[in-house]
Amino acid sequence: MMKFRFRRQGADPQREKLKQELFTFHKTVEHGFPNQPSALAFDPELRIMAIGTRSGAVKIYGAPGVEFTGLHRDAATVTQMHFLPGQGRLLTLLDDSSLHLWEIIQRNGCAHLEEGLSFHPPSRPSFGNASFPAGLTRVTVVLLAAGDTVVLGTESGSIFFLDVATLALLEGQTLSPDEVLRSVPDDYRCGKALGPVESLQGHLQDPSKILIGYSRGLLVIWSQATQSVEHVFLGNQQLESLCWGRGGSNIISSHSDGSYAIWSTDTGSPPTLQPTVVTTPYGPFPCKAINKILWRSCESGDHFIIFSGGMPRASYGDRHCVSVLRAETLVTLDFTSRVIDFFTVHSTQPEDGFDNPQALAVLLEEELVVLDLQTPGWPAVPAPYLAPLHSSAITCSAHVANVPSKLWARIVSAGERQSPQPASSALSWPITGGRNLAQEPSQRGLLLTGHEDGTVRFWDASGVALRPLYKLSTAGLFQTDCEHADSLAQAVEDDWPPFRKVGCFDPYSDDPRLGIQKVALCKYTAQMVVAGTAGQVLVLELSDVPGEHTVSVASVDLLQDREGFTWKGHERLSPHTGPLPWPAGFQPRVLIQCLPPAAVTAVALHAEWSLVAFGTSHGFGLFDYQRKSPVLARCTLHPNDSLAMEGPLSRVKSLKKSLRQSFRRIRKSRVSGKKRATTASSKLQEANAQLAEQTCPHDVEMTPVQRRIEPRSADDSLSGVVRCLYFADTFLRDATHHGPTMWAGTNSGSVFAYALEVPAATAGGEKRPEQAVEAVLGKEVQLMHRAPVVAIAVLDGRGRPLPEPYEASRDLAQAPDMQGGHAVLIASEEQFKVFTLPKVSAKTKFKLTAHEGCRVRKVALATFASVMSEDYAETCLACLTNLGDVHVFSVPGLRPQVHYSCIRKEDISGIASCVFTRHGQGFYLISPSEFERFSLSARNITEPLCSLDISWPQNATQPRLQESPKLSQANGTRDIILAPESCEGSPSSAHSKRADTMEPPEAALSPVSIDSAASGDTMLDTTGDVTVEYVKDFLG
């Protein structure tokens, strides 16, 4: 009998084929700004840009939607990058002095980035590396000369030449420091070495000439054609960088003392002793080094000199600046993060006599800024991608699918009004290389991110490029201490240097209480709820015109004067009084302040009923924002929940208190074994456990899915935290009358269901009558294992989730089945369970017991469309665990469909930030500035599909080492595993390019159907199941 019960059932081939058409797993694209960038390159012919990172990632960007991603096999920092112009090839230098050649190749109509060749110099050339010269140790600088030669400058001062086609050393072409010193006067040598090679620059007109700069200050023009030194410049100041003038008649050098010098190359063959111009822009006091300098000529005669660094060391040495000098105009661009590199977009054709720069692109540690150099004032150019998601730290996120076109246009219009008009740029985005082959998205998707500074940002998440649309700020509603400090700081600011704040990255929050914790948006009424750290809940409405009005303020006491609790956390925010001006966009109408002012942990918005529900660690409330009056307040604190009153900044238990509670638990466990109450439920649990122990033979091989779910103590810390809130029109009173309900789930496994009396709207009217809403407690369910309730959803008579407010009434979704019996799906951290309504009796359950310690973290209902049939789709439950695994279950049967490894289990922040979409996709943070996008749907995939117009040279075809797929992320999981065993190939989708390693889901998951005929003895199996729910019916 036992062998029969634990035997796995065979897979249905038809169902497995259908799974292939519905589900597949892809990590598709990384949205946002690369984490910890370290190198920058630009191809002026193809108009593409590359960014390298400290984790070894390579990212190439062109026009919006044109993206390529690669990852070096060794997690080393990319220190330099150089494009082979017009070839779609990129040379990277890592901090281990290895060189790597990447190529963009065409395959199946789309372009891909692959690593072709690599060059690894020996770490100790004198030992067993006779083929390598002794001076080839640490590479300090790389130059691509004459299109087919790689020039390497080293720490020893030697210069080596490699063939681009093979990355092999060219024999007999090494330039040693001794050979250079022979061209230098004796009095300059002074017995000192030249130092490392600091800079290598190729001549724009004559590719055979190379400008070499050594650390000590010596500059040399080397001719590859004659293999000789053509000119020597005897600099004495430590060198930082070099740049040729357009025609090659001048050289500009920058130095460690904050100065730059201009040298003339037309002085003949003798060594040049002095530069023609030496300037310290921010002198005369000691200045920091000018790290990089560019000289760009203009047809008008006023040339550009652009450099980073050089600030006065004592007063502004901590500033991150790039200075732009043209004629008598000097602007000091002041950034909030470190400058990595910069380049100009200018004319590079040899026949053009001038550079005529169009734009300046500055790569910073936390953002990319592009300035228009052709418009007076040099304004910033709005970026269509690479926006810094973390301009203020992300605290929450949400996704809104199928946004109506009218609402989309209104949000875009509000965002366009936010950009400063006087400094608007006439220049379009200058990085326009490649062609986006992806089709226009069939629906618009919004990604909403809440931030630490009290802002909510709206992003266009419809395609590959995550485009900023609109920013909502809530800080203006409240009085903060920073307002006076800001005005003083602006008054003290000097006129010199001429600083200009550039960029939007601002890591500092004015007040930590402003942080956004939860966001909800009704896409049909353009109403929104934003909840924050200090218990503030804002109800906002989209307005197309600016306005001035007073925001209604209401307080809701969640403790309800309960004695014995004293709040020790932060104070609530003080709102401004009186009418306030509001720009076009989302404008606040009502402010609800929870008491105590703890962080809001859950919100729900029902615009059709004009209700908003909110929860904290103390309880939950219901507010009627049409009448601007509270409807309900319920405290969920347990008498021992003192930790909830201490606030987020004082949650450290004393050792004395911890020891006392430990001894109490030991004493309680001993006593409970002797004096356990002999109730009917406890007798049933004891009988189940005894029967399981007696009937289970020890030699039976059990599936590794079964684990006893231990009931948690009712007095666990923070058991009153409200985890989820939900509105539904369903059957709660009886099986014949349905009506509005509100559901709340807590950390202690409690579920509260309220029947609401909401006045019905008149025929054709949008708003309901001005009558009070009433709430009556209908059911109270206590999960016996007391696991936190993560999500609640009501299913209609067909087993489908109820539509969103206004979806059915506006014929935007199929009306729910209100004839058959409804059911409620309750997802806790340990199991999923479906209960019938209105009796709340268990129908189906699924215990998530794949591994010890496995817990549910995120849950969402999603629609998965078939790739073979336009009309077939299934609604399933997507689940992310604390181990980083994603599971998909059927609804309402709760049968496992697929199981993938998505996020590393050590990546706690990534798991906590995950957001599922309604169409089987998801987002999670792989760094503070990047979202990883993934897809569980075989049909709904958003990934880069692009191409480059490249004329390949004949010898460009080289053996490939490896393709760098989009799945090999610098910050994510490298391996994609776990899916049904019978699905041996990837689905027959045009987007499916990879076959995943499969594994039978039964090895990790086990469904139980309580209503089935064979379920009688399943409840008495070896799990020792104690999950008998306790249900109170207050309406019976």
Swiss-Prot record:
This is Lethal(2) giant larvae protein homolog 1. The modification Phosphothreonine is found at T957. It comes from Rattus norvegicus (Rat). The modification Phosphoserine is found at S662, S964, S982, S989. Belongs to the WD repeat L(2)GL family. Cortical cytoskeleton protein found in a complex involved in maintaining cell polarity and epithelial integrity. Involved in the regulation of mitotic spindle orientation, proliferation, differentiation and tissue organization of neuroepithelial cells. Involved in axonogenesis through RAB10 activation thereby regulating vesicular membrane trafficking toward the axonal plasma membrane. GO terms for biological process: axonogenesis; cortical actin cytoskeleton organization; establishment of spindle orientation; exocytosis; Golgi to plasma membrane transport; maintenance of apical/basal cell polarity; protein-containing complex assembly; regulation of establishment or maintenance of cell polarity. One of its GO terms (molecular function) is myosin II binding. Associated with nonmuscle myosin II heavy chain. Interacts with PRKCI/aPKC, PARD6B/Par-6 and PARD6A. Interacts with STX4A. Interacts with DCAF1. Interacts with RAB10 (GDP-bound form); the interaction is direct and promotes RAB10 association with membranes and activation through competition with the Rab inhibitor GDI1. Residues 678-693 have a biased composition (Polar residues). Residues 670-694, 980-1002 are annotated as: Disordered. One of its GO terms (cellular component) is trans-Golgi network membrane.
